[in-house]
């Protein structure tokens, strides 16, 4: 019968002390990269698996971090899982994922379960509107980092994307190129990112004196509902639509393709994307880039630091989004004028 490898076997194979092996595996002291590699190679060769209960007893840590997301099918959060895991795994932590489906009851249960001794800390993209709702589910000073959304009653340790200026640029350019009836697809109304984007939309519409724009704001509870809402907006006379996440942007473009609409002539689409890779499949439309990879990695580093020092304060760290028109309007200028109005002023008044 094959004997299970012990820590002494790893130390002997790597030609280091048992304490060095322990420091490498538990991240309790600096060890040179050369020595760390020797230890990890020995662990791999011997198939050594540390005793988790013993490690918890010695260090007080489970070496597990929870990640609570509202929609695992959304590419933004799928990417977030990978980015957070990339960072925390280098510190010896494993990831436990909980998908809440934007359900507050599920979110409360997930936080309560994870914080009850399963994980050392949590990264969360919350469905809840306020901090107190989440705080009630976990012990005092439990390490937690909020992602993508901030809560109404407290600036807790958070990583967010600041898309206000990028969104404003996209909307201004649409209007200045003659598109005044702009449909605006956003997520559920009670989360901070939705609130901020709708706020910018209203400000720009007011600035350009487009009072009827309020009817073109559509709150999407389920991604699959986006398709039907695009049809309703197009039927209502919208000649431009902005989709404020990658999944919705894909759905809008699917609608355009299904209905054989001429992109740039009959309708213009502005999208939010989380990577340049995603943009390659979007006809080079105007886009707002959300720095999701950077946000995920930053959240990973922050939660590890928070676990190491529960009194550490970060407050809100905002990463700027970028707007890229992809030179769309210049390339499509002739087509825009071919919608039935050759005079640009006349076009602006009719679209």
What do these predicted regions represent?
Residues 1-61, 76, 335, 347, ...:
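N-terminal helix-turn-helix DNA-binding module of bacterial transcription factors
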Residues 38, 76-90, 166-170, 192-211, ...:
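Short, solvent-exposed amphipathic alpha-helices that sit
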Residues 159-184, 199-200, 223-231, 249, ...:
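Hydrophobic alpha-helical segments within soluble ligand-binding/sensing domains
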Residues 1-2, 60-172, 176, 229-236:
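Alpha-helical recognition/docking segments in bacterial nutrient-uptake
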Residues 180-181, 212-215, 262-268:
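Short acidic capping loops at alpha-helix termini that bridge into adjacent secondary structure
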Residues 88-99, 206-223:
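Short beta-strand elements in bilobed, periplasmic/extracellular small-molecule ligand-binding domains
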Residues 229-351:
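Flexible loop/turn connectors
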Residues 170-208, 312-331:
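An alpha-beta-alpha
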